[in-house]
Swiss-Prot record:
Range of residues in the leader sequence: 1-19
Family, similarity comment: Belongs to the NlpA lipoprotein family.
Gene: plpC
UniProt name for this protein: Outer membrane lipoprotein 3
Localization annotation: Cell outer membrane
Pfam families according to UniProt: Lipoprotein_9
Keywords: Cell outer membrane, Lipoprotein, Membrane, Palmitate, Signal
Amino acid sequence: MKIMKLAGAVAIFSLFLTACNDKAEKLKVGVISGPEHKVMEVAAKIAKEKYNRDVELVVFTDYATPNAALDKGDLDLNAFQHKPYLDNQIQEKGYKLVPVGNTFVYPIAAYSKKIKSLAELKDGDTIAVPNDPTNLARALILLEKQDLIKLRADAGLKATSVDIIENPRKLVIQEIEAPLLPRTLDDVAFSIINTTYAGQNGLTPTKDGIFVEDKDSPYVNLIVARENNQHSEAVKDLVKAYQTEEVYNKANEEFKGAMIKGW
């Protein structure tokens, strides 16, 4: 009888330790520098206050490193990418990563220092687009919606320049690394830039874009975990902390309304 009581006490104590360890688990979350970092700071604060979760934010300046760090185990989560980009990374790199929650749609837009509308665009003008596969497709789809090009019907979210079957304005389309696109504005008719790098250069789609991606975009950004930690209570708490009005209000402040709630 004493042995059974002792075993029961040990089991209860073990469960207590497990619960305590889970609550004490510190999350390392990868984010991109700039406004997205500031938005995640609010989520981290809520995670601590509401769920007693300590969150360390690891800041990156590129789109390649956060997934490699997460897959390696140097991070517990990251929050910077949409699903088409994640799917492409998984296919190319073999990462064991999964989305665990939505954040916002940050619409891409065309920006220009040379023209105020497409009516001023000239035949043969040079334009700039992102060169990474997913955001290149996103930019090409946006160009097609403006009737500037036509893509193959089956190109979909993996469209590349070889899928352009009509270019009636004979536009020269330059593919540039995303962080460098704002620097091209002095040299091209317009550049298609995502919200992160536009915002870092004082640009917002609703105010400065000559045309903008709409609310029906499939490119909602994600909170991403590894397959082996996706069901962690700590991960779930961070997602709940992010998907709050406080975070939405901070994003609205940082992005000046240039985002759409994804949850």
